Amino acid sequence: MNYKLATKSVLEDNSWIKPGLASWEWWHDAALYGPDVNFVSGCNYDTYKYYIDFASSFHVPYIVMDAGWAETVLNPNKPNSQMRLPELIQYGKDKNVGIILWLSWVAVEQNFDLFKTYEDWGIKGVKID
């Protein structure tokens, strides 16, 4: 239905767009539990490593990191140090799972040059609210 209602794309080359399923922790507030969770869950490296492992085991190509991945919502250039984002990006790459970052529209408006930075980091996409 969307294809029938949408106007023709103005993009001549959209081969760079890689759609796919994503695992998103916002639904349960990154609160993991169960017999295989032997760490404190939250906005930290171990939690997102767990999500990457989950996504990899079920062939989900992306995870979304929601609010909390950055030190502050309005400074999207400085990751939360507990996330160890460069390590997670590499871990995801090794497991064929890309990382999508959540952003506030205000942060994007005030830091429009960040998309090149994210590309350099290896981020696969953004989710903007």
Predicted regions and their residues:
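Conserved structural scaffold segments of CAZyme catalytic domains across common CAZy folds
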Residues: 1-94
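Aromatic- and carboxylate-enriched substrate-binding clefts and catalytic-loop regions
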Residues: 67-129
